[in-house]
A protein has these predicted regions:
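Phosphate/nucleotide-binding beta-alpha loop and adjacent structural elements of enzyme active sites
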Residues: 1-179
Length: 179
């Protein structure tokens, strides 16, 4: 996972929400070695891989929780082909198999750690929870320098663009998917 590197930018705090196996966290750790990186991943198997893949990086803080708009436990349906497509929305996966996971209000988490005014990069890839997560931090968006967000669906795109355009210049990069 490669994201554009911002020139003359030395982030101190990065949030990787939906860290999956840790590829993006490692990308950030390599390119921004002075940054603290909080990596959120709620499912057991993905979290084990996240731990294993990132064990050599001292600046990655792994959190076995998912971000959401409230604190709750929820079913995450486990895609049988790709753990990166696990979702709380059953119809987004190809499986009835699920895992009960802990979800936390991201805004409250950031406030409790006194991090709301210090976020340099926020990356979100959460298979359908993007709007819920943005709503939990909406009042803090203006304090985030760079946001990388993967969203799914035209309806989500419109809502996300509306939320983000109030505080950020939005640049879209269209993904091409192929089976």
């Amino acid at each position: 996972y490669a994201y554009p590197i911002v020139e003359n930018f030395n982030p101190k705090l990065i949030l990787d929400v939906g860290a999956n196996l840790g590829a993006t966290s490692m990308f950030f750790a390599i390119n921004y070695p002075k940054a603290r990186i909080f990596s959120f991943e709620p499912t057991q198997m993905n979290f084990r891989w996240l731990q294993k893949n990132t064990e050599g990086f001292k600046n990655i803080i792994r959190i076995k929780k998912g971000a959401y708009f409230k604190d709750t436990n929820a079913k995450i349906f486990l895609d049988s082909e790709n753990g990166g497509r696990n979702s709380i929305y059953k119809d987004w996966t190809n499986s009835d198999k699920y895992e009960l996971v802990e979800l936390i209000n991201l805004g409250k988490f950031l406030e409790s750690k006194n991090l709301v005014k210090k976020i340099d990069i926020l990356k979100i890839d959460t298979e359908g929870c993007e709007i819920d997560i943005l709503s939990s931090i909406e009042q803090h968006l203006k304090n985030i320098q760079v946001i990388y967000l993967e969203y799914h669906g035209k309806n989500n795109e419109e809502v996300i663009m509306e939320i983000l355009s109030e505080s950020h210049v939005v640049k879209q990069k269209k993904a091409v998917a192929q089976k």
